[in-house]
Swiss-Prot record:
Outcome when changing residue 63 to Q: Slight decrease of DNA binding
Function: Transcription factor that is necessary for placental development. Involved in the control of expression of placental growth factor (PGF) and other placenta-specific genes. Binds to the trophoblast-specific element 2 (TSE2) of the aromatase gene enhancer. Binds to the SYDE1 promoter. Has a central role in mediating the differentiation of trophoblast cells along both the villous and extravillous pathways in placental development.
Binding annotation for Zn(2+) 1: 76, 125, 152, 154
Record's keyword terms, sorted: Developmental protein, DNA-binding, Metal-binding, Nucleus, Transcription, Transcription regulation, Ubl conjugation, Zinc
Keyword Coiled coil: no
GO biological process: astrocyte fate commitment; branching involved in labyrinthine layer morphogenesis; cell differentiation involved in embryonic placenta development; positive regulation of DNA-templated transcription; positive regulation of syncytium formation by plasma membrane fusion; positive regulation of transcription by RNA polymerase II; regulation of cell differentiation involved in embryonic placenta development; regulation of DNA-templated transcription
Modification(s) after translation: Polyubiquitinated in the presence of UBE2D2 and FBXW2 (in vitro).
Lineage: Eukaryota, Metazoa, Chordata, Craniata, Vertebrata
Binding site for Zn(2+) 2: 82, 86, 113, 116
Name under which the protein is recorded: Chorion-specific transcription factor GCMa
GO cellular component, one term: nucleus
Source organism (scientific name): Mus musculus (Mouse)
UniProt DNA-binding region: 14-169
């Protein structure tokens, strides 16, 4: 059927050329997009076609210069094949997509075949009179006009999606191969039996609720400014053994000591409770009943004498400073107390270092060698918020304490093992001592 048999409108649609000044606009139907256009063909696509907007083609095409700015010109690059003409396991030939850049395409030809590691070669396109097949794209009005000149004389290369999938699979294979080679190069790791961590390898944490095991030769200065949680816990209860893997159980204070030693140790612990603010201040006359002996002791320290060389050391409880009320034992608590406390309290055995700092010297100056190999702090009690380091034992006017008599130095390791008292018993016993 010749062109003379068509209507003038149909003739215009069929006889247009991409280089015409005016292209037909009375197009009733548009063509479906063609992925592999070949030979001398022409297509009219809708301007809404996304593939036509992208000028997509499965042939390896690159943009070329054109004197007409309204027309996009693309030339075919051909196909890259294996020089050995190898095939994959599925029976397909190796037809790679050529790189668009000239340098990248030259570098691609020096690579080996991904299937047989043979050399690659480029088959150029010469389907348009010895020149590459050319595709033309032109946007005009509501349509996109496409025209191809020439016939491809080479096999179809892989599409862009196939090329991307092949590169991804190649990267995965290379990564797995390198990992396998790395694992083969390493010596086989011997499976070690599970080791139970020893006591020395475990972290040693300082806590108020659990015991801490220190070396027997540990020596540290006694810091007067104790933490607030430890202000009411001067009586410590020590376990016979300490195990990091098990629970620590405290001994019953009344099961190992009689009532006389029990009273004696509680009296010693009461003399070690003092305030953090008053430890740096000199005593005031009238506060203590034995102020003159305290002055004599302070003078000896100022003259350079070591307080540890004296025969005895006074243990003075601090005065009631800023608590708004006093602690007095109840009648019910006093009814059961005479059954445990003897009628004549024995004299406290001196020999420990006083915790009262030297007024003329630096704080925390005196040091005491303490064996803390099995110390376990007792339960903590939170004192009032005003002065957490002051504890009252009754009215200041009623306190009368006698100086301890001369005696041999008591065993520090034994006497430091004070019993852990709860808040009620500690308060009850210390108030009873002040009333007597």
């Amino acid at each position: 059927m010749e062109l003379d048999d068509f209507d003038p409108e149909d003739k215009e649609i069929l006889s247009w050329d991409i280089n015409d000044v005016k292209l037909p606009q009375n197009v009733k139907t548009t063509d479906w997009f063609q992925e592999w256009p070949d030979s001398y063909v022409k297509h009219i696509y809708s301007s809404d076609d996304r593939n036509a907007q992208r000028h997509l083609s499965s042939w390896a095409m690159r943009n070329t210069n054109n004197h007409n700015s309204r027309i996009l010109k693309k030339s075919c690059l051909g196909v890259v094949v294996c020089s050995r003409d190898c095939s994959t396991e599925e029976g397909r030939k190796i037809y790679l997509r050529p790189a668009i850049c000239d340098k990248a395409r030259q570098k691609q030809q020096r690579k080996s075949c991904p299937n047989c590691n043979g050399p690659l070669k480029l088959i150029p396109c010469r389907g348009h009179g010895g020149f590459p097949v050319t595709n033309f794209w032109r946007h005009d009005g509501r349509f996109i006009f496409f025209q191809s000149k020439g016939e491809h004389d080479h096999p179809r290369p892989e599409t862009k999606l196939e090329a991307e999938a092949r590169r991804a699979m190649k990267k995965v294979h290379m990564a797995s191969a390198s990992n396998s080679l790395r694992m083969k190069g390493r010596p086989a790791a011997k499976a070690l039996p599970a080791e139970i961590p020893s006591q020395g390898s475990l972290p040693l944490t300082w806590s108020f609720q659990e015991g801490v095991q220190l070396p027997g030769t540990y020596s540290t200065p006694l810091i007067a400014n104790a933490p607030q949680q430890n202000s009411l816990n001067d009586c410590l209860s020590f376990p016979k053994s300490y195990d990091l893997g098990g629970s620590t159980e405290l001994e019953d204070p009344t099961s190992t000591l009689d009532s006389m030693k029990f009273y004696e140790r509680c009296k010693f612990s009461s003399s070690r409770i003092y305030g953090s603010e008053e430890q740096f201040q000199p005593p005031v006359p009238g506060t203590y009943g034995d102020y003159e002996d305290l002055q004599t002791w302070n003078k000896n320290v100022a003259l350079g004498r070591n307080p540890s060389d004296d025969i005895y050391y006074p243990a003075y409880p601090l005065p009631v400073a800023s608590w708004p009320y006093d602690y007095f034992p109840s009648q019910n608590s006093l009814e059961h107390l005479p059954q445990q406390v003897p009628s004549e309290p024995p004299a406290a055995q001196p020999g420990c270092h006083p915790l009262w700092s030297n007024p003329g010297g630096e704080p925390y100056e005196e040091k005491v060698s303490v064996d803390l190999s099995s110390y376990v702090p007792s339960l903590t009690y939170h004192p009032p918020q005003q002065d957490p380091f002051l504890l009252t034992y009754g009215s200041p006017t009623q306190q009368q304490h006698a100086l301890p008599g001369k005696s041999n130095r008591w065993d520090f390791d034994e006497e430091m093992a004070c019993m852990g008292l709860d808040h009620f018993n500690n308060e009850m016993l210390l108030n009873f001592c002040s009333l007597r």
